[in-house]
């Protein structure tokens, strides 16, 4: 007797091989890489991610990382503000509310950095970078 322990999965594999050798079981097909497709997303998973309304929601607040949460929410609202400007124009009341919200929630250094460097210069040319999407 051997004192080495066998993994139960190895035992099953050895049994399968012996059955195949005796002709009692067909061999398993070889695995071809890249043939595994992701599982289909069910309705419950979709609703959990997007909410009942079907719109995507922000991730839950992580209390361990308050600065990260603040920065992420600041940037998301900043992007919503620019989407509002593209859709409704600069003078829309909803856009002004978002602008005020961005200015109140975001640190002044961050607002000036993303607003002036990435927003105003590239916005006049019709494009700007979007690193994080809602």
Swiss-Prot record:
Annotated SUPFAM superfamilies: Cytochrome c oxidase subunit h
Localisation per UniProt entry: Mitochondrion
Basic and acidic residues biased stretches: 7-19, 44-61
Parts of the chain that traverse the membrane: none
Chain span(s) of sequence motif Cx10C motif: 95-106
Cellular component terms per the entry's GO annotation: mitochondrion; respiratory chain complex IV
Domain CHCH per the UniProt entry, residue ranges: 71-114
Region called Disordered, residue ranges: 1-61
Disulfide bonding pattern of the chain: 74-106, 84-95
InterPro entries (UniProt xref): COX6B-like (IPR048280), CX6/COA6-like_sf (IPR036549), Cyt_c_oxidase_su6B (IPR003213)
A Pfam family of this chain: COX6B
Residue window of motif Cx9C motif: 74-84
Record keywords, A-Z: Disulfide bond, Mitochondrion
Function statement: This protein is one of the nuclear-coded polypeptide chains of cytochrome c oxidase, the terminal oxidase in mitochondrial electron transport. This protein may be one of the heme-binding subunits of the oxidase.
Protein family membership: Belongs to the cytochrome c oxidase subunit 6B (TC 3.D.4.8) family.
Protein name: Putative cytochrome c oxidase subunit 6b-like
